[in-house]
């Protein structure tokens, strides 16, 4: 009864997972983040046949979107920093929003140039999914936690999206046709950027789940090997039978080693291709937290009213960062599980073939030690969350210092320079 219930739960989670992934794929297609078509029979993404003319038009379209977005960033950020610069704190917020806009353009261009490589990595993930299903003899790989984390991340993304895009629908942004077109382009590019940023989180989550399934498969294999070493008369085997089983288990371990190697390489390829987007993901959410805190303090000082929306959005952006760090840390931890297993103890010195497979696999794990590093600067793990929190606290002290020294007060010098 329990196994039947677990099977139904696994099937339901797999159905939901496929539905959500298909929905994300269609959103990416609609936003032109992906131009590949999905072959459902082979479970692979195929590049659409494009002539040189279509490719030129695609590049031209990207350039137009980038130029329009770059020209519209004052309007896009006016809801946060205001339409006039009156204080030194306003200048600081302006510099922060400008840096986000510049990185958004860079992320957009890099993503457009690397679409073919991104498609290849996605196809390798899809091939690994099928290969792990065969090796582990499982029909459903995506557990309920995949659906939970996916929906949780989607909720935070939609909260931030509504908060950032709703101000663009003010009447002042639709006074003439040029502003209407510009607003539409800005929303289009921002949604495409958010889609790519969510893919960063999703890739690490999928890698972690695949690593977890492979680790569980090795644990189950070691459990099945226990009768080989058993001294109980009821389970004792002939030497020939032991050698036969150990050869089979050695072949199974070799296949696991091959999958671990491919999973290591595909995770690193994913990280390398999207490392600028991952950096932008971290920077965007961090700067948004800073801007929300700035907006909160500004309203508190000027209007004597507390804007709780700013605080809520700051926590939403922090949750985005925490989810990314947790998924990256989860992937690394799951990749190291086999090192903690007694592979070199179970059935050691009983068969040379098995001993060699274990030695090769453990050596491979030592060589292919997974580290999720962005641009060689920092590791994505749970410890990085503490670094982000300390940076936010430091920024709060800077804001407090600005307030004490009159940084939030209107300055004639600033007004004269930016009017």
Curated annotation (Swiss-Prot):
Q: How does it sit in the membrane?
A: Multi-pass membrane protein
GO function term, MF aspect, one: ligand-gated monoatomic ion channel activity
Enumerate the subcellular locations listed in this protein's record, separating them with semicolons.
Cell membrane
Any single biological process term in GO: male courtship behavior
Extract the InterPro entries matched here: 7TM_chemorcpt (IPR013604)
Tissue expression, as annotated, is: In larvae, is expressed in neurons of the dorsal pharyngeal sense organs.
What keywords are assigned to this protein?
Cell membrane, Membrane, Receptor, Transducer, Transmembrane, Transmembrane helix
State the coiled-coil residue ranges: none
- Extracellular-side stretches of the chain, per the record, are 77-90, 167-184, 299-305, 405-419
An example Gene Ontology CC term for this record: neuronal cell body
Deletion phenotype, per the entry, is: Disrupts fly aversion to caffeine.
Give ranges for the Cytoplasmic compartment. 1-55, 112-145, 206-277, 327-383
List where the protein spans the membrane: 56-76, 91-111, 146-166, 185-205, 278-298, 306-326, 384-404
What is the recorded function of this protein according to its Swiss-Prot or TrEMBL entry? Gustatory receptor required for response to the bitter in taste neurons. Gr93a cells respond to bitter compounds such as caffeine. Flies avoid bitter substances, suggesting that Gr93a neuron activity is sufficient to mediate avoidance behavior.
Family affiliation = Belongs to the insect chemoreceptor superfamily. Gustatory receptor (GR) family. Gr93a subfamily.
Q: What protein does this entry describe?
A: Gustatory receptor for bitter taste 93a
Organism per entry: Drosophila melanogaster
Q: What is the gene name?
A: Gr93a
